[in-house]
């Protein structure tokens, strides 16, 4: 029975036996290919194995099989997150530099669509910022700057404490960006903004000490 196979697959995933779980999910799909949610489970299992290429392939099958009304910004976001995971993977053997760059470019494209589909949410722009930061790890080109600035403006307009950690991320990037540009007054403004939220923030304190 396909239900038994899918249940067994879920059990194996819970036991962190991801390779075996993928086999059982595959058996269930062979018996009933309308169980599109199983592609998501297969994707999750591959991700837990740090096999992002297979995770992305499985998730794309899941997403493509969804009815139009289920293709929400949230389901699309997960695809972008997988591309981001591949692009920032610490496994240099599994992910080659060319694949890493392509994955980050794909992540940026997906998060752009998320932003367009959910313009009132900051998450699409935040993940565009993170993705562009990963493409510019030394912050030499400031690729993430416009996205962090946009997120900052969006969150300041909401004026809610639950966004403080995201604001600190924005301020940290911008503070470092202006520090590299030797624009010390502007850099100090951002580090002080962090301390206004979190007076014990060690990174901000260290940056300000260095500017002095």
Feature roles, as predicted:
Residues 27-28, 61-65, 114, 151, ...:
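Canonical positions in the second alpha-helix
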Residues 33, 67-70, 119-120, 199:
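Short coil turns that delineate tetratricopeptide repeat
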Residues 10, 44-47, 81, 85-88, ...:
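Residue-level recognition of tetratricopeptide repeat
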Residues 1-3:
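Short, small-residue-biased leader/transition segments that mark boundaries at the very start
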Residues 15, 49, 86, 101, ...:
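Structural motif corresponding to the intra-repeat A-B loop/turn of tetratricopeptide repeats
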């Amino acid at each position: 029975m396909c239900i038994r196979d899918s249940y067994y697959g879920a059990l194996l995933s819970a036991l962190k036996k991801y390779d075996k779980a993928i086999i059982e999910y595959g058996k269930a799909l062979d018996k009933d290919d309308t169980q599109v949610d199983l592609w998501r489970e297969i994707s999750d299992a591959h991700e837990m194995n740090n096999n992002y290429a297979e995770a992305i392939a499985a998730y794309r099958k899941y997403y493509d099989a969804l009815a139009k009304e289920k293709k929400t910004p949230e389901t699309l976001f997960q695809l972008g997150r997988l591309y981001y995971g591949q692009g920032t993977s610490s496994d240099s053997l599994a992910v080659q530099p060319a694949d890493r760059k392509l994955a980050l470019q794909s992540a940026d494209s997906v998060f752009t669509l998320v932003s367009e589909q959910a313009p009132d949410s900051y998450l699409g722009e935040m993940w565009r910022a993170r993705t562009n930061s990963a493409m510019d790890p030394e912050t030499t080109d400031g690729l993430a700057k416009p996205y962090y600035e946009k997120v900052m403006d969006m969150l300041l307009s909401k004026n809610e404490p639950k966004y403080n950690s995201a604001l600190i991320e924005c301020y940290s990037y911008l503070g470092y960006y202006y520090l590299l540009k030797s624009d010390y007054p502007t850099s100090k403004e951002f580090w002080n903004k962090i301390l206004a939220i979190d007076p014990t923030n060690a990174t901000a304190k260290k940056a300000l000490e260095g500017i002095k």
